[in-house]
């Protein structure tokens, strides 16, 4: 392995993109925003193609943005760092407000460095549920459009993790291994890059199927279910290439990412299966 060190990719980018006065702009949060923006723009186009009004669509971004942000943050704090965030009052404040209580008693703006993808998905569900209830729209249509767009957002989220040198893989001697200098000097699987590439491929695949079959030739819930099934099945298996993120995972048969992926895979399979029934019911109504 030592002889091959020169062939590995040495990865040590500065996670900070820029400083704006007291504020720190990080690649991680920037990638999140780019991913959400691209998803929003694509969904806006889908809404127009499907003849859905701008008045109905405009509020959706805010529901999803805050749902993903709050859910992702709570998911990280509760599932991955409960011993820090749930033990002291000032740490509890840091769960939702991107500030850190300094030893001298002052507060420092830090930006969100910890957002869990599973928590973001659950938060997105809550945001969409509130949106559909308040705007009186078909939830399955919204979820299908989300399923078509989510892959591109997930791609940029994982690129943000890569820029942060976090969620690193296990030690390996594959020729494309990364040496994450901020962690240690061992070549490791670039798990973030694996996921980013896979999610981008899933995005292209789902978009291709949608363009071929459209929204009406399949039952509602199909694209949403396909997205959940593809992404979280891959996520389940790619976890085997990653280092554990929290100590208590070492004693578990599966890590937290795998445990949280299982209900989402089941939901995805159910959504695909039940979409056939909804398609048949729709055809009967049309006759």
Identify the residue ranges that each predicted region occupies:
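A feature for loop-to-transmembrane-helix boundaries and adjacent hydrophobic helices
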Residues: 1-287
């Amino acid at each position: 392995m030592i002889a091959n060190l020169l062939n590995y990719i040495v990865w040590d980018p500065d996670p900070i993109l820029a400083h704006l006065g007291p504020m720190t702009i990080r690649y991680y949060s920037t990638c999140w925003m780019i991913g959400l923006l691209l998803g929003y723009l694509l969904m806006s186009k889908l809404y127009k193609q499907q003849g859905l009004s701008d008045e109905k669509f405009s509020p959706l971004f805010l529901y999803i943005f805050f749902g993903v942000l709050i859910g992702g943050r709570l998911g990280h704090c509760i599932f991955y760092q409960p011993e820090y965030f749930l033990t002291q009052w000032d740490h509890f404040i840091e769960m939702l407000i991107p500030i850190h209580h300094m030893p001298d008693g002052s507060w420092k703006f830090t930006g969100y460095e910890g957002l869990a993808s599973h928590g973001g998905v659950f938060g997105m569900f809550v945001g969409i549920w509130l949106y559909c209830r308040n705007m009186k729209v078909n939830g399955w249509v919204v979820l299908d459009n989300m399923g078509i767009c989510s892959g591109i957002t997930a791609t940029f989220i994982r690129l943000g993790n890569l820029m942060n040198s976090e969620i690193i893989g296990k030690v390996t001697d594959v020729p494309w291994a990364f040496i994450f200098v901020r962690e240690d000097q061992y070549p490791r699987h670039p798990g973030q890059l694996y996921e980013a590439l896979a999610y981008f491929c899933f995005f292209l695949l789902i978009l291709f199927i949608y363009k071929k079959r459209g929204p009406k030739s399949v039952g509602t819930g199909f694209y949403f279910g396909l997205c959940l099934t593809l992404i979280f099945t891959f996520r389940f298996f790619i976890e085997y290439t990653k280092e554990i993120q929290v100590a208590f995972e070492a004693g578990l048969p599966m890590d937290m990412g795998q445990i949280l992926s299982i209900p989402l895979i089941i939901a995805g399979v159910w959504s695909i299966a039940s979409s056939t029934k909804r398609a048949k019911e729709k055809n009967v109504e049309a006759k």
